[in-house]
Amino acid sequence: MRTIDDLQVAGHRVLVRSDLNVPLDRSGDTPRITDDGRVRASVPTIAALLDRGARVIVTSHLGRPKGEPDPRYSLEPVAARLGELLGRPVAFAGDGTGDIAGAHAREVVAGLGDGEVALLENLRFSPGETSKDAVTRASFADALAALAEFYVGDAFGAVHRAHASVADVPKRLPHAAGRLVLTELDVLRRLSADPARPYAVVLGGSKVSDKLGVIRALLPKVDALLVGGGMCFTFLAALGHGVGGSLLEAEMIDTCKALLAEGGDRIVLPTDVVVADRFAADAQTAVVPADGIGDGWLGLDIGPASTALFAGRLDGAATVFWNGPMGVFELAPFAAGTRGVAKAIAAGDGFSVVGGGDSAAAVRTLGIPEDAFSHISTGGGASLEYLEGKTLPGLAALDV
């Protein structure tokens, strides 16, 4: 896989596929970025290219617009923040239409000098970006490729998507992997190939079905698999416990039974949970044993004894991978489990990886220093699919 060090970019136009898919608060007059982690992660690649005299064209998606312009998902606020982080202006090439690589974008790109940068509008404003139709996708990829002379793939959070800007444009231009993609790959290789032991994996989130592939891939390799979040209730049901009104995938109970039989005492489940009479910040709550959830009660967090149990199993771990919150951390009464587990991971001396998505958001929301972890990934789904051993279209396109 080539790197940007292998490209002679001075004076040339370079299309960089970054992942600037950040959360925006639109409650005020001006949209505000609430977590700029992905923007910050994109800077090393863009800055390195600019320092070498490249004319950089940054591309990204934001949210899930339906293949047409939607001002709620414009990248214009991101252009401003990217410029602040780079210490130089970022020309925004959006014109309010879905013609992402059209006449206006070509005009902005033509005006770039060496060491200057532009940001195109949200790629998903064009139906060609995510189309299942190869001809439609190819047409959009052709338009993007026509803007540049080189391509750099740096959107690790999107490499599992067979989208035009990720998997098709690299087939049309000399290409290389960006700094972020290379860093993410190095981290994931440390997690999957001969990790330092003891090796602990913490999985949370809503559904067992979403994490089944990574559970099956990692279970033979780990010394402890700690299960929290909504998915733990299907495991508890597999033990024969009632789970009240908690999230339950009934069709996954037999699968969980088989996993528990395979994993034995390496699979660690909560011993107590925080329950509520309804899904709300002001709900009535209680801490109950994991086998004592009453009818009509919802499990929304692991309990204090479980948090201590998980922290104990994390103590002394040489490698830790965490993906998925322990509870509904966005609501204060149900944040303690996620906070406690995050702090336990942060306090360790081993190699610790936060697996992107909601876990990364939890670290920032709960005010835990990011530098307390060895790495905070920008790719939730991409990380999981890599660890499952799947072929990721965006990586395959760069590796040729």
Curated annotation (Swiss-Prot):
Q: Where does substrate bind?
A: 19-21, 38, 61-64, 124, 161
Against InterPro entries, the record matches this protein to: Phosphoglycerate_kinase, Phosphoglycerate_kinase_CS, Phosphoglycerate_kinase_N, Phosphoglycerate_kinase_sf
- EC number(s): the record gives 2.7.2.3
User: Which cellular compartments is it found in?
Assistant: Cytoplasm
- Offer one Pfam family short name for this entry: PGK
Can you name one GO molecular function term for this protein?
A: phosphoglycerate kinase activity
CDD domains recorded for this chain?
A: Phosphoglycerate_kinase
Major location category of this protein:
cytoplasm
Q: Which domain of life is it from?
A: Bacteria
Some GO term, biological process aspect, for this entry: which one?
A: glycolytic process
Return the similarity comment.
Belongs to the phosphoglycerate kinase family.
Q: What is this protein called?
A: Phosphoglycerate kinase
The organism is: Frankia alni (strain DSM 45986 / CECT 9034 / ACN14a)
Gene name of the encoded protein: pgk
